[in-house]
């Protein structure tokens, strides 16, 4: 303890971080890296497998995600247009029907095609190239032997009787990351996202076994290809799982089993994403607002402990804002005549995300921009068109008025998924901690939580401002509420949206009931890129955890399963906060 009070943070990171791997999985991306790194690898959380087509079938890319409603219903469209007009009045921009072209106007002038672009315009970030799905390394029938003696069992080839230089094996069997999102639509691949809307993406067409296999394969590929950790050496490393509050107990168990039993880490620990985000910014008390790609979570943290009754989940995020951007342009008749389909063509979602990150912001008044939009209808002809994007300040306002977003609905896991009878957490969460005083840690952060349906409150149509106010007021103590209203912390990729923080400050303060003696609301500026704050917090918690009471060993997990923790707060939470502040101030 005395050593930690005097050690230089950079030295501590070098000593303790080299053999720690921090994993922060999300619905759209997974962030993985060594604790000694400044920033993690941020890789799309997906996998594409080559599928064999029947002779009569037309080769095509299939997306395994099964949405309940891929298109908005007429009532949803009506609500969306009303929400747009509300936003338009607040931002002082024209309503939808005030900015439409006349009937005799074939194409607005802003949609003129551009045949020649300047060198600067050619550098547009929204342009992507198709993934080459052919395995160029296969040139003969001689088997390719890996330079390492140990072969990773997760990446062994399956059929021994197939010629390596056959036409079928010329295709890459598995494609990961962004390359998987850029596979041409005419290629025979099945694209899968194992996590959607903060849960395992289980459906009738995507079984639990397949979800776990894909998670294992994706993480193994990142560890091998990006972090260069040989499978035979993984027993020398420990893993820190930074998990969002949306995951239920069984999903947490399965991911822990993947890390310890399948990937081969010697020990592992789990930290809540909200708690890690607070420590990632050097705080021990904060209202953490995590705006992810598909889920927004609001959780209050007090003295290094996430308060379970304050946790809220909102089923929308950055991806919904990107799709709303497309809808707004089409309603304004500014989008080119391209078959842009972010649901069925992942490369279109990549383009929309780039446009959103480049142009969307919250500000008053008309806000337009000229950009080059690309068409990815066919891999042999990638067209482009220069267009004027209109009302770019409307889509991010969907965080405050979610009816303008109309998010896709992913089917929840079947009810039998929650019947995990060997999970003691679901049976003992109301039991006194004194009964388990001899517990050796493990799930200490979760063992006071009920099972998922009552642990996390979900709201479909409330805005982010109402969620923040509701979460903070649910704490019930005025002094704590004042601290939390002055310590609102935005994390996640969408948290970087220009103009979001001041709008939230003003609207949160105006939404607080008049009978509450609260005079101030403040959104704190993030100390680093908001997307990586929870990951960095996991690094700090892992490096500074000297006792490792909650760490689980691979042998213990395989033999005994769930360990009941002590349910206590961090005994040294204030000390951890001081160390975190020291780390950032050095």
Swiss-Prot record:
InterPro entries: Actin, ATPase_NBD. It comes from the Eukaryota. One of its GO terms (cellular component) is Ino80 complex. One of its GO terms (biological process) is double-strand break repair. Residues 141-169 are annotated as: Disordered. SMART domains: ACTIN. Belongs to the actin family. ARP8 subfamily. This is Actin-related protein 9. It comes from Oryza sativa subsp. japonica.
């Amino acid at each position: 303890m005395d050593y930690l009070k005097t050690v230089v943070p950079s030295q501590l990171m070098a000593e303790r971080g080299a053999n720690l791997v921090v994993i922060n999985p999300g619905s759209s991306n997974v962030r993985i890296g060594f604790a000694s790194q400044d920033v993690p690898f941020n890789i799309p959380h997906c996998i594409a497998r080559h599928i064999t087509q029947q002779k009569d079938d037309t080769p095509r890319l299939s997306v395994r995600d099964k949405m309940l409603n891929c298109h908005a219903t007429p009532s949803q469209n009506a609500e969306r247009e009303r929400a747009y007009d509300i936003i338009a009045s607040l931002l002082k921009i024209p309503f939808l029907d005030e900015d439409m072209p006349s009937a005799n106007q074939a194409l607005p002038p802003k949609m003129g095609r551009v045949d020649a672009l300047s060198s600067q315009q050619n550098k547009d970030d929204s342009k992507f190239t198709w993934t080459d799905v052919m395995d160029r390394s296969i040139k003969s029938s001689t088997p390719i032997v890996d330079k390492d003696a140990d072969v990773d069992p997760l990446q062994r080839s399956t059929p021994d009787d197939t010629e390596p230089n056959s036409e079928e094996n010329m295709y890459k069997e598995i494609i990961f990351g962004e390359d998987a999102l850029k596979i041409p639509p005419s290629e025979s691949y099945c694209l899968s996202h194992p996590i959607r809307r903060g849960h395992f993406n289980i459906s009738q067409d995507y079984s639990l076994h397949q979800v776990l296999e894909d998670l294992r394969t994706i993480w193994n590929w990142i560890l091998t290809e990006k972090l260069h950790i040989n499978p035979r050496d993984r027993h020398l490393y420990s893993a820190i799982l930074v998990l969002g509050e949306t995951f239920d107990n069984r999903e947490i168990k399965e991911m822990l089993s993947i890390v310890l039993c399948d990937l081969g880490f010697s020990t592992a620990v789990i930290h809540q994403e909200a708690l890690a985000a607070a420590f990632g910014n050097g705080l021990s008390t904060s209202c953490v607002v995590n705006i992810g790609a598909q889920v927004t979570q609001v959780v209050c943290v007090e003295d290094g402990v996430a308060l379970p009754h304050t946790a809220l989940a909102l089923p929308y995020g950055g991806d919904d804002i990107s799709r709303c951007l497309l809808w707004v342009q089409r309603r304004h008749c500014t989008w080119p005549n391209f078959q842009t389909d972010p649901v069925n063509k992942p490369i279109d979602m990549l383009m929309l995300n780039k446009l959103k990150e480049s142009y969307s912001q919250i500000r008053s008044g008309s806000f337009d921009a000229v950009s080059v939009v690309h068409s990815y209808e066919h891999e042999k002809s990638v067209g482009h068109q220069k267009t004027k994007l209109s009302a770019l300040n409307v889509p991010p306002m969907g965080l405050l008025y979610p009816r303008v977003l109309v998010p896709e609905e992913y089917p929840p896991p079947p009810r039998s998924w929650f019947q995990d009878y060997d999970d003691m957490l679901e049976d003992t969460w109301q039991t006194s901690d004194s009964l388990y005083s001899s517990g050796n840690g493990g799930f200490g952060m979760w063992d006071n939580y009920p099972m998922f349906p009552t642990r996390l409150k979900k709201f479909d149509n409330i805005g982010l401002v109402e969620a923040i106010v509701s979460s903070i007021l649910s704490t019930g103590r005025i002094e704590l509420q004042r601290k939390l209203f002055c310590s609102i912390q935005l994390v996640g990729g969408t948290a970087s949206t220009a103009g979001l923080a001041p709008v939230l400050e003003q609207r949160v303060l105006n939404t607080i009931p008049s009978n509450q003696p609260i005079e101030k609301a403040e959104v704190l500026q993030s100390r680093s890129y908001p997307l990586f704050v929870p990951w960095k917090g996991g690094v700090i918690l892992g490096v500074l955890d000297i006792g490792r009471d909650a760490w689980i060993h691979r042998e213990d997990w395989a033999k005994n399963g769930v360990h009941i923790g002590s349910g206590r707060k961090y005994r040294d939470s204030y000390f951890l906060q001081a160390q975190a502040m020291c780390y950032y101030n050095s």
